[in-house]
């Protein structure tokens, strides 16, 4: 398997684990030192693997199902040298306050073998995310 194929296979495994919305599934595709970064100006954060796991556990009370998919393989960017992949993702969720949909760009940096995600940068559509947060606040 070429490095490009390995990187794309890792992205597919990550998306599948993301859809399970289970911290143990996410741990199978990430290095123990993997960092998650929210990079939108109004939604900046950095989470260690432990922090990301805690966040997922808390969020499971809100999200009943998660379905993320790559929007268009033709705009996926693979940098074999730096072991990075950029994908545009559509996210559809069923939540305690009804449906939630968003789009995001994921920049995923893999380990040397290309088999595990070592760092991920997420850029969400913050307007949609803020609307969803407002619905959650109204429901409380």
From Swiss-Prot:
<comment type="function">
    <text>Part of the gene cluster B that mediates the biosynthesis of austinol and dehydroaustinol, two fungal meroterpenoids. The first step of the pathway is the synthesis of 3,5-dimethylorsellinic acid by the polyketide synthase ausA. 3,5-dimethylorsellinic acid is then prenylated by the polyprenyl transferase ausN. Further epoxidation by the FAD-dependent monooxygenase ausM and cyclization by the probable terpene cyclase ausL lead to the formation of protoaustinoid A.</text>
</comment>
<comment type="subunit">
    <text>Homodimer.</text>
</comment>
<dbReference type="InterPro" id="IPR050977">
    <property type="entry name" value="Fungal_Meroterpenoid_Isomerase"/>
</dbReference>
<dbReference type="GO" id="GO:0016114">
    <property type="term" value="P:terpenoid biosynthetic process"/>
</dbReference>
<protein>
    <recommendedName>
        <fullName>Austinoid biosynthesis clusters protein S</fullName>
    </recommendedName>
</protein>
<comment type="similarity">
    <text>Belongs to the trt14 isomerase family.</text>
</comment>
<comment type="pathway">
    <text>Secondary metabolite biosynthesis; terpenoid biosynthesis.</text>
</comment>
């Amino acid at each position: 398997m070429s490095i490009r194929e390995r990187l794309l296979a890792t992205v597919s495994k990550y998306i599948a684990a993301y859809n399970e919305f289970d911290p143990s599934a996410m741990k199978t595709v990430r290095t123990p030192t993997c960092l998650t970064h929210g990079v939108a100006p109004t939604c900046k954060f950095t989470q260690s693997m432990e922090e990301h796991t805690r966040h997922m556990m808390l969020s499971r009370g809100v999200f009943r199902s998660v379905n993320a998919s790559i929007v268009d393989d033709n705009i996926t960017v693979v940098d074999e040298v730096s072991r990075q992949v950029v994908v545009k993702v559509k996210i559809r969720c069923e939540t305690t306050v009804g449906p939630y949909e968003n789009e995001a760009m994921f920049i995923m940096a893999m380990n040397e073998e290309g088999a595990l995600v070592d760092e991920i940068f997420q850029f969400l559509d913050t307007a949609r995310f803020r609307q969803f947060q407002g619905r959650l606040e109204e429901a409380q």
